[in-house]
């Protein structure tokens, strides 16, 4: 495992995890307002 591969996998995981989190946060904020 090279450092570049680890960085690429990490960035992909961050994007995949950030997608649903952003949607949930937006829905929660709209619900509270």
Swiss-Prot record:
Cell compartments where the protein resides: Plastid, Chloroplast thylakoid membrane
Organism superkingdom: Eukaryota
Any single GO CC term annotated in Swiss-Prot or TrEMBL for this entry: chloroplast thylakoid membrane
Family matches, as InterPro entries: PSII_Ycf12_core-subunit
Segments traversing the membrane: 5-25
Family named by the database record: Belongs to the Psb30/Ycf12 family.
Physiological role: A core subunit of photosystem II (PSII), probably helps stabilize the reaction center.
Quaternary state and interactors: PSII is composed of 1 copy each of membrane proteins PsbA, PsbB, PsbC, PsbD, PsbE, PsbF, PsbH, PsbI, PsbJ, PsbK, PsbL, PsbM, PsbT, PsbX, PsbY, PsbZ, Psb30/Ycf12, peripheral proteins of the oxygen-evolving complex and a large number of cofactors. It forms dimeric complexes.
Name of protein: Photosystem II reaction center protein Psb30
Organism: Oltmannsiellopsis viridis
Gene that encodes the chain: psb30
